A protein has these predicted regions:
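Post-His helix in hydrolase/transferase enzymes
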Residues: 169-183
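Alpha/beta-hydrolase active-site loop
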Residues: 32-60
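Active-site machinery of serine-nucleophile hydrolases
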Residues: 1-40
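The feature captures the conserved acid-bearing segment of alpha/beta-hydrolase catalytic domains
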Residues: 96-168
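Alpha/beta-hydrolase-fold serine-hydrolase catalytic core, especially in secreted/extracellular enzymes
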Residues: 188-193
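Stable alpha-helical elements in mature extracytoplasmic
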Residues: 3-7, 46-53, 73
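Primarily recognizes the serine-hydrolase "nucleophile elbow" in alpha/beta-hydrolase
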Residues: 55-110
């Protein structure tokens, strides 16, 4: 199971798992195109689709606020979605790819030409809480890459977790991450830069 599904099981609060379009066995179903899970995996089309689902869920539940959480590429989408969802109170990323250009260069991959890059967007709203965590042994998204990607953000808290890598051990930390976020959101903490 994807990491985020395992983490959701540890949280008693209501939550929804939003998979990226054309992932999880649906790559050949229309309107999927290989670009939507390769070069355009973070395209405006993908982000708009996720935002539309979030808006529908907000209206169905008559919710006023939203907490976006993502691991790896899910963190990329969470940051891009927050730009369009003013209801977003906080974004949490675990090993989040917040600079897709730096990531492709680091690994020697082709640039994601059809995708948006969170690092190229203006700083997020000053009221948006951001908690970003990365494992010290993460060689998929090394800690310095995440730190550089968040330098211009107003209320970003970046933490490196000893002994963790890209996927190892996050369920152990999850209850603490949730508690920290709830406390910070409720108290108006995280003064920012």
């Amino acid at each position: 199971y994807p990491l985020m599904l395992r983490l959701m099981a540890l949280d008693p609060a209501p939550s929804v798992y939003l998979a990226r379009p054309c992932y999880n066995g649906r790559v050949t179903a229309p309107p999927c195109d290989s670009a939507l899970w390769t070069q355009a995996r973070y395209s405006a089309e993908v982000v708009d689709s996720a935002v539309a689902v979030a808006r529908r869920l907000l209206s169905q539940r008559q919710s006023q606020t939203l907490l976006l959480i993502g691991h790896s590429g899910g963190g990329t989408l969470a940051m891009l979605m927050a730009d369009q969802l003013p209801e977003t109170r906080a974004v949490i990323t675990l090993a989040g790819n917040l600079d897709t250009d730096a990531w492709t260069q680091y690994h020697g991959y082709e640039p994601l030409r059809g995708s948006l890059n969170p690092a190229r967007r203006p700083p997020r709203d000053k009221h948006l809480l951001q908690l970003h965590r990365v494992g010290e042994n993460d060689d998929t998204l090394p800690p310095p890459m995440l730190k550089r990607a968040t330098e211009t953000q107003w209320r970003a808290r970046v933490g490196t977790v000893a002994g963790y890598d890209h996927s190892c051990c996050w369920p152990q930390l999850w209850p603490i991450v949730l508690e920290t976020t709830v406390q910070a959101a409720g108290s108006g903490a995280w003064a920012g830069r």
